UniProtKB/Swiss-Prot annotation:
InterPro entries: ATPase_NBD (IPR043129), Chaperone_DnaK (IPR012725), Heat_shock_70_CS (IPR018181), HSP70_C_sf (IPR029048), HSP70_peptide-bd_sf (IPR029047), Hsp_70_fam (IPR013126). It comes from Rhodobacter capsulatus (Rhodopseudomonas capsulata). Belongs to the heat shock protein 70 family. Residues 621-631 have a biased composition (Acidic residues). It comes from the Bacteria. The gene is dnaK. The keyword Nucleotide-binding applies. Keywords: ATP-binding, Chaperone, Nucleotide-binding, Phosphoprotein, Stress response. SUPFAM superfamilies: Actin-like ATPase domain, Heat shock protein 70kD (HSP70), C-terminal subdomain, Heat shock protein 70kD (HSP70), peptide-binding domain. Induction: By stress conditions e.g. heat shock. This is Chaperone protein DnaK. It holds the Pfam family HSP70. The modification Phosphothreonine is found at T197.
């Protein structure tokens, strides 16, 4: 049976591993390195990947694509993409569908295409070692990747000629590698600060069971940001001394980036390093070449990136809160990602959790090792390992009044499936629009819309009668599909959220922060909408009953009900949920006599009820009103 490989598709470096017997093993590439730079370069006559691409980046900056993982599944309008445009020497353009693509040598490539080139390199590395063709893989992604980013990663695998059996979260993969041979029960935190993304996951491990309790993160925080702080500092110092802005020169900027990365790595073990870049520019007036010779201390580096390190601690606090555990209950902190080699990062993590992190895993390789273990589980080579991951954000749909009705809460174990019955909001409504949202706010408009679709040709019926079953399905890859079915006709419509849309990391951060800051306001707004929905529904049904059965009660009762209806109608114009609820109760009480008269009349017409007859049932039971969009004849054609 052909091997299933595990791939860590990283922002800065990528790594491939396989199961070798009972243990995972990292495979060296053709250059003899255990990790491969996630860089692709396009020259006049060839395409370079990995170290060869990195070596020529200075002389070919506009055609050398790096950190493309930060663009995968993103839109050109995303704030992160706008930020990236100013930082990278290559061109980021609109792919024609709103997605962020790259342009090199006049040709456009999607981030999935560029990522596929890196995956192909990983595939070839494994094939060279195994001596056989590889067609299946497990690929890792940041835990906080949204649906679009996961879809795009899967697409990249497909382009690379790989069947992606599973998309697995990076911290979860790291936990698998850490806990494979451990039999005791532990609660661990995986702190994963990589080249472009940050994740924190809290897991419980117990003799082969790996259960993720919560996850949080930032998909635009990583080593690339640390490098840019050094680059900006070096450029500013050079400008002060020579009056030349190196950031305007793409070749000089690429040299600075390489120097910054090298200095950052050196300062993890040394207290000072020298940055020496001869002939980096020239004096425009005299033509004299200018050189950069500068010392950078560890203390200076720490001051430049202090806020970035601190920014990683906020998601840590959120993850602990969501998991319902205290810092003291964390038995082990596992560090993952190259940036965790920085002494200051280790210090801050130690201070936050109150304990020294575990240093028994290689932060650059542990994610690929975990992916290989998951591949072994899927292939049947690894026994007695059960992995339970979670979805990072709540999912639901917009219902009447713009309310966000959750079907799946954040940190729900996946795979998962949840259904709920909704109905129409108008009489004879023949179509409903299902709008799918992701987020934590109570009102749909405050969350991120992932997609929408229409369920049409609903048979004419009074409002509240049709039963529309909406089903959310999240697979083990964290990819979402939504289905709506008219239970009366059996007609259904389905959508899998496509990679052309998705969330930015700022959107996710904003959703949770806003949800906490505005929880009370959201609650009040939701309470008002729900009160109005209840009031309008009661008003409609009572007036309809009065019209059809008003002759079954005396005139004073009819008058009392009409007065209560008018009072409720007036209260619905207000923004006071208490007033509306009071009017609802008054009308309910007033209409009680009418209800009794209707049932008595029905009972006398039907005669004595037999034991096997069903009692009266309301079609409104457990039904939530759904918002809809009038499609119009032309739109539906």
């Amino acid at each position: 049976m052909a091997k299933v490989i595990g791939i860590d598709l990283g922002t800065t470096n990528s790594c491939v591993a396989i199961m070798d017997g009972s243990q995972p093993r990292v495979i060296e590439n053709s250059e003899g390195a255990r990790t491969t730079p996630s860089i692709v370069a396009y020259t006049d006559n060839e395409r370079l990947v990995g170290q060869p691409a990195k070596r020529q980046a200075v002389t070919n900056p506009t055609n050398t694509v790096f950190a493309v993982k930060r663009l995968i599944g993103r839109r050109t309008t995303d704030a992160e993409v706008e930020k990236d445009k100013k930082l990278v020497p290559y061109n980021i353009v609109d792919g024609g569908n709103g997605d962020a693509w790259v342009e090199v040598r006049g040709e456009k490539f999607s981030p999935a295409q560029v990522s596929a080139v890196i995956l192909q390199k990983m595939k070839e590395t494994a094939e060279s070692y195994l001596g056989e063709t590889v067609t299946q893989a497990v690929i890792t992604v940041p835990a906080y990747f949204n649906d679009a980013q996961r879809q795009a990663t899967k697409d990249a695998g497909k382009i690379a000629g790989l069947e992606v059996l599973r998309i697995i979260n990076e911290p979860t993969a790291a936990a698998l590698a850490y806990g494979l041979d451990k039999k005791d029960s532990k609660t661990i935190a995986v702190y994963d600060l990589g080249g472009g993304t940050f994740d924190i996951s809290v897991l419980e491990i117990d003799d082969g069971l790996f259960e993720v309790k919560s996850t949080n993160g930032d998909t635009f925080l990583g080593g690339e940001d640390f490098d840019m702080r050094i680059v900006n500092y070096l450029a500013d110092e050079f400008k002060k001394e020579h009056g030349v802005d190196l950031t305007k020169d793409k070749m000089a900027l690429q040299r600075l980036k390489e120097a910054a990365e090298k200095a950052k790595i050196e300062l993890s073990s040394a207290s000072q390093t020298e940055i020496n870049q001869p002939f980096i520019s020239m004096n425009a007036a005299t033509g004299v070449p200018l050189h950069m010779v500068m010392k950078l201390t560890r203390a200076k580096l720490e001051s430049l990136v202090d806020d970035l390190i601190k920014a990683s601690l906020k998601p840590c606090a959120a993850a602990l809160k969501d998991a319902g555990v205290s810092k003291d209950e964390i038995d082990e902190v596992v560090l993952v990602g190259g940036m965790t080699r920085m002494p200051r990062v280790v210090e801050e993590v130690t201070k936050f959790f109150g304990k020294e992190p575990h240093k028994g895993v290689n932060p650059d390789e542990v994610v690929a090792l975990g992916a290989a273990i998951q591949a072994g589980v899927l292939q049947g080579d690894v026994k007695d390992v059960v992995l339970l991951d979670v979805t990072p954000l709540s999912l639901g749909i917009e219902t009447l009044g713009g309310v966000f009705t959750r079907l799946i809460d954040r940190n729900t174990t996946i795979p998962t499936k949840k259904s709920q019955i909704f109905s129409t909001a108008e009489d004879n409504q023949n179509a409903v629009t299902i709008r799918v949202f992701q987020g934590e706010r109570e009102m749909a408009a405050d969350n991120k819309m992932l997609g929408m679709f229409n369920l049409e040709n609903i048979p004419p019926a009074p409002r509240g009668v049709p039963q529309i079953e909406v089903t959310f399905d999240i697979d083990a890859n964290g990819i979402v599909s939504v289905k709506a079915k008219d239970k009366g006709t059996g007609k259904e419509q389905q959508i899998t959220i496509q990679a052309s849309g998705g969330l930015s990391d700022d959107d996710i951060e904003k959703m949770i922060k806003d949800a906490e800051a505005n929880a009370e306001a959201d609650k009040k707004r939701k309470e008002l909408v729900e009160a109005k929905n209840t009031g309008e529904s009661l008003l409609h049904s009572t007036r309809k009953s009065l019209e059809e059965h008003g002759d079954k009660v005396d005139g004073s009762t009819v008058e009392m009900i009409e007065l209560a209806c008018n009072a409720l109608e007036e209260s619905l114009k207000s923004e006071d949920p208490g007033k509306i609820k009071g009017a609802v109760q008054n009308l309910t009480d007033a209409a009680m006599k009418l209800g009794e008269a209707i049932y008595k009349a029905q009972a006398s017409e039907a005669g004595p009820a037999s034991d096997d007859e069903d009692g009266p049932r309301s079609v409104d039971d457990d039904i939530v009103d759904a918002d809809f969009e009038d499609m119009g004849e032309n739109k539906r054609k």
